[in-house]
Amino acid sequence: VRLLIALTLLIGSSTAFAATQCTTAERSTWQDPEAFQAQLKEQGYKINKFKVTKRNCYKTYGFDKDGRRVEIYHDPVTGKAVKTEYHD
């Protein structure tokens, strides 16, 4: 039983630290980064930093329309948020 619990915790912790993968699509199908950021700004986001991650995400750091500090991983093809982290 202890071994099963230990394995469960080990597997769970390794997936918790896995990097966020947003897409496997060819880069030619991705949205234009500048146009994508402009769309976010139109929705009320303030972008302090924007980057493309090693795991094929558009990652934004800044503030949402409610003024909360956020870090968001976006699928660069669809623009949908894959992961959102709020920071105090």
Briefly describe each language-model feature range.
Residues Y58-Y61, E71, G79:
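Conserved histidines in hydrophobic membrane contexts and catalytic metal-binding motifs
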